[in-house]
């Protein structure tokens, strides 16, 4: 089903509202001539920010054309901007990157020197994000009509935030949105089953309990389930498995559990949970007490049409478990966005997860694309980047953006493949995040992070004369929550030495966690979205077998390198068949919401 064909027919459907028709027409108009829109966007960004320190360094002298911009302004990564961002963070209010005041920083899931990256934001950015967000339901209603007749059970949470030394908030993009006046004053009750008081509660346990309880009370109104990440939705199912008895008790008695002590939630829930519902309680007990939870989502929420969850890139690993619990419901990956900017949406949301493509909206930012066949360790030729309208189907590119808030030719790190066009606007499949080895949810651990963690932890073995001679890893998403698994092959100075004790190995697990970046540690400590890190010790010679296996599959013996992350089933089976002991982190690593500025 195509958006444009429905519009050309004069009416998307008899139930399509005037607002939805307007949104669909906007999509058609903005994608017809993206190059013209891009030229206008860049001109606006450069003209309004011409007096910034950053642009003055490159002698643009007020030029707003693409040729001058591309020939004079360099392509950069976060480390190139770190000094400028630090100045803003420390309270410098002069026009360093943007002529408009920086109102807050959105924290990226990427890290620099172990700490979250800070992305500058200006007040009007929320309008751009909301513009794109307002297009989602009009598109979805083309494929699943009548969604406005029910509600979405979305598990939404605020995350910890901090304040920079200069007084600016630093927080994730969605936390910023949930705490904005736009969300606080919106009529979310007509859209979500979760009350705002629960979404805004900083205690994730109370928030999850309340959101699940409301979803159960309104089970017949629910027509879609969602979360930001698939791990979040699976965590909610796991929470229900562990708490259905208490939830059923609340419903049976019409009283709220004593574990909920947040005043705002208690006040709000007094109007929602205001009478006993023995019939619903007995139904839940009957369903949840079964050992087999296959299809549990449609059993409890029978009117659910789809799951609203991102399952592209590394998140595709969660698809089998989502299919199991949902009974095979469609999964809609609707939006492509980051803390740097919002990029585009999926105009065919009911497609298979493997076929998801996002249409980039040319009014969001100025987009350039770095062909992904260059030497990643070398410099980037500033003029080699491709315009949005000039990308070629089948080719892969790294996304480079210039934003209204003051990022200029910034490498986002996302690798995208062009799959086609909607009108003249290209559509992209998200392939992966550059240089990321391990990811469970919002965490992103690269090879350097992992190597540092292994080196720090392996020092604990030195006293016993033992060292790590090889290692690899994988992100285990079959457990809830998912967790990092690290395979170690050890070598003792004295071959008669026994393996290190479980106590020592557990300390190694914790030391690895302490060495990983702030995003990982927040996910472990505050968000509880990642489980304890596991080290599996394998037999000596295992990594030689791994090399033999790879060579038998066509790898060159001269070019073979031990993969620092594995995912192929035969390799996983080989490694697991050689495990002699497994050890878990015994406690939580250190983490504080207060960043070092």
Curated annotation (Swiss-Prot):
Keyword set includes Plastid: no
Protein's name according to its UniProt entry: Indole-3-acetic acid-amido synthetase GH3.4
InterPro entries cross-referenced by the UniProt entry: GH3, GH3_C, GH3_M
Originating organism: Arabidopsis thaliana
Induction: By auxin.
Family named by the database record: Belongs to the IAA-amido conjugating enzyme family.
Keyword S-adenosyl-L-methionine: no
GO MF: indole-3-acetic acid amido synthetase activity
Keywords, ordered alphabetically: Ligase
């Amino acid at each position: 089903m195509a958006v444009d064909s429905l519009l050309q027919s004069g009416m998307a459907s008899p139930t399509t509202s005037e607002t939805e028709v307007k949104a669909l027409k906007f999509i058609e108009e903005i994608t017809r001539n993206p190059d013209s829109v891009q030229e206008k966007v860049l001109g606006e960004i450069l003209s309004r920010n011409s007096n910034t320190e950053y642009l003055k360094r490159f002698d643009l002298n007020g030029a707003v054309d693409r040729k001058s911009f591309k020939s004079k302004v360099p392509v950069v990564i976060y480390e190139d901007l770190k000094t400028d961002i630090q100045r803003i963070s420390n309270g410098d209010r002069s026009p360093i990157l943007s002529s408009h005041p920086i109102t807050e920083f959105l924290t990226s899931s990427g890290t620099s020197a172990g700490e979250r990256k800070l992305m500058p934001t200006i007040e009007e950015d929320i309008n751009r994000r909301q513009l794109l967000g307002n297009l989602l339901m009009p598109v979805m209603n083309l494929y699943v009509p009548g969604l406005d007749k029910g509600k979405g059970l979305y598990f939404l949470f605020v995350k910890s935030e901090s304040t920079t030394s200069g007084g600016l908030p630093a927080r994730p993009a969605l936390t910023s949105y949930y705490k904005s006046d736009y969300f606080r004053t919106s009529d979310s009750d007509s859209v979500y089953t979760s009350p705002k008081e629960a979404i805004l509660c900083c205690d994730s346990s109370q928030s999850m309990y309340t959101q699940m309880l409301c979803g159960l009370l309104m089970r017949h109104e629910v027509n879609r389930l969602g979360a930001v990440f698939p791990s979040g939705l699976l965590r909610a199912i796991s929470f229900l498995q562990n708490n259905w008895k208490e939830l059923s008790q609340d419903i049976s008695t019409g009283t709220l559990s004593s574990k909920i002590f947040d005043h705002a939630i208690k006040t709000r829930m007094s109007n929602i949970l205001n009478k006993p519902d023995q019939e619903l309680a007995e139904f839940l007990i009957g369903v949840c007490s079964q050992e087999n939870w296959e299809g549990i989502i449609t059993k409890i929420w029978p009117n659910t049409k789809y799951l609203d969850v991102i399952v592209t890139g590394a998140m595709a690993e969660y698809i089998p478990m989502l299919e199991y619990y949902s009974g095979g419901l469609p999964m809609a990956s609707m939006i492509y966005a980051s803390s740097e900017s919002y990029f585009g949406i999926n105009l065919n949301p009911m497609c298979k997860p493997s076929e998801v493509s996002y249409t980039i909206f040319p009014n969001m930012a100025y987009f350039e694309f770095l062909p992904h066949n260059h030497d990643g360790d070398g410099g980037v030729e500033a003029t080699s980047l491709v315009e949005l309208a000039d990308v070629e189907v089948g080719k892969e590119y790294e996304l480079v953006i210039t934003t209204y808030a003051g990022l200029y030719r910034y490498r986002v790190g996302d690798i995208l493949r062009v799959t086609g066009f909607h009108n003249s606007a290209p559509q992209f499949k998200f392939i992966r995040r550059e240089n990321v080895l391990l990811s469970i949810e919002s965490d992103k651990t690269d090879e350097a992070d992992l190597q540092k963690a292994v080196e720090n932890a392996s020092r604990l073995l030195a006293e016993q004369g033992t060292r790590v001679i090889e290692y690899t890893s994988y992100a285990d998403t079959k457990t809830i929550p998912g967790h990092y698994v690290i395979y170690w092959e050890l070598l003792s100075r004295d071959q008669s030495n026994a393996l290190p004790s479980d106590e020592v190995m557990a300390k190694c697990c914790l030391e690895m966690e302490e060495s990983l970046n702030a995003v990982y540690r927040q996910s472990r400590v505050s968000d509880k979205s990642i489980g304890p890190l596991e080290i599996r010790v394998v037999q000596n010679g295992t990594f030689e077998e791994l090399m033999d296996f790879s060579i038998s599959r066509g790898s060159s013996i001269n070019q073979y390198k031990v993969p620092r992350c594995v995912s192929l089933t035969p390799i996983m089976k080989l490694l697991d068949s050689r495990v002699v002991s497994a050890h878990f982190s015994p406690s939580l690593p250190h983490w504080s919401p207060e960043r070092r500025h």
